[in-house]
Each structure stands twice: as structure tokens, then as C-alpha cells.
């Protein structure tokens, strides 16, 4: 058994707090990519970061997500078979850039937030448009955390609507 004195605990706590504060400060986004001050601002921030031409600078997307964030894209086949693809933010950016100059716009349709202290879960329906035409819609499940700079996304799970999984009416505008 290890015995730790009160002074040692305070020293370890101060060291950890300093490391965490330094980590959060080092990851603060540029002024042009202000983080949302409340979780209600996350859907609009994501729409702005995702929308645009494929070769758009994705610095704001990287700033909005924590460094180790993951994006999971789930799908449901016509036969009911479930599959998924897990990506880092950098992998997502590379895949988007491969589209060429195609411009996409993501718009949140409706969202619901559950919040406790510095964590929040957002359940959001979206529509994806290309050249003004809707090409997809689905659900985003977004987990977020508040740090020194504002609210950031730790993970996003996405499932596009399909014939076997239509959007529920409560998530339509």
C-alpha cells in the first residue's frame, strides 16, 4: 500500500491542473474560429466548419473537435446489415478533399441537448445539400465537453437516412 501525504496530493493536483490548463490553452482555436460559449452553438459551428467547397481550409473543424476526437459513420444496408467507418478528423478532411471542388452545405434541421455540468450530448437531424439540392439527411449524435476556450466536440456519430431507417417525424422541421 502506498501512503501519500496531504502535501504530496496538493502538489500532484497542482501539477495535473497546470498540465490540463496548458493543454487546453495550447489547443485554443484562432480568433476566426471562436468556440461556442454554450452547447446550443455547436450545431451552427459544425455546419459552418463542414459546409463549403471540398478544398476549404478545415482549421475551424480541427479547432472545434478535441485532438483525439473520432467520427463514426454508421450505415444500415437494405438487408438490415449494420456497418460503420471510424475516422479521425484528419482522415475525414483527406476524404472530403478527395471530392474535388464540389460544394456541400450541411444544415441542422432540429436538435435536442442533454447537459450536465461541462458535458453535453446533442442529438441533431441534418440535411446535406449539393448545388442547392438535398442529397442526404440523417442524424448526428454529438458528444461535447467544455474546456477553457468554450465547447468542443469529442465525438460525432452519423447515420444517414435510408429506406430501412427513415428519419423519425420528431426530427423533421
Which residues make up each language-model segment?
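Acidic/histidine-rich, surface-exposed loop or edge segments in extracytoplasmic proteins
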Residues: 43, 69, 73-77
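Short beta-strand edge/turn micro-motifs at domain boundaries
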Residues: 121, 137-165
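A mature extracytoplasmic/lumenal domain signature
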Residues: 65, 75-77, 124-126, 140, ...
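Hydrophobic pocket/interface hotspot
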Residues: 61, 69, 122, 144
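Short, low-complexity N-terminal intrinsically disordered segments enriched in polar/charged residues
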Residues: 3, 22-64, 171-173
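A short, polar/proline- and glycine-enriched secondary-structure boundary/capping micro-motif
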Residues: 82-84, 132-136, 163-170
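Surface-exposed, charged secondary-structure patches
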Residues: 27, 70-71, 83-134
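Bacterial N-terminal signal peptides
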Residues: 6-19
Amino acid at each position: 500500500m502506498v501512503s501519500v501525504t496531504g502535501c504530496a496530493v496538493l502538489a500532484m493536483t497542482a501539477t495535473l491542473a497546470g498540465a490540463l490548463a496548458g493543454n487546453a490553452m495550447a489547443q485554443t482555436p484562432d480568433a476566426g474560429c471562436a468556440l461556442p460559449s454554450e452547447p446550443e452553438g455547436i450545431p451552427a459551428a459544425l455546419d459552418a466548419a463542414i459546409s463549403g467547397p471540398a478544398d476549404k481550409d478545415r482549421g475551424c473543424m480541427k479547432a472545434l473537435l478535441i485532438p483525439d476526437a473520432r467520427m463514426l459513420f454508421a450505415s444500415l444496408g437494405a438487408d438490415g446489415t449494420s456497418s460503420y467507418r471510424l475516422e479521425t478528423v484528419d482522415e475525414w478532411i483527406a476524404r472530403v478533399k478527395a471530392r474535388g471542388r464540389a460544394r456541400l452545405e450541411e444544415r441542422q434541421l432540429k436538435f435536442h441537448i442533454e447537459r450536465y455540468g461541462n458535458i453535453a450530448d446533442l442529438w441533431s437531424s441534418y440535411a446535406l445539400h449539393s448545388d442547392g439540392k438535398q442529397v442526404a439527411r440523417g442524424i448526428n449524435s454529438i458528444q461535447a465537453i467544455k474546456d477553457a476556450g468554450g465547447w468542443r466536440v469529442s465525438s460525432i456519430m452519423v447515420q444517414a437516412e435510408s429506406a430501412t431507417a427513415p428519419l423519425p417525424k420528431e426530427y423533421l422541421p
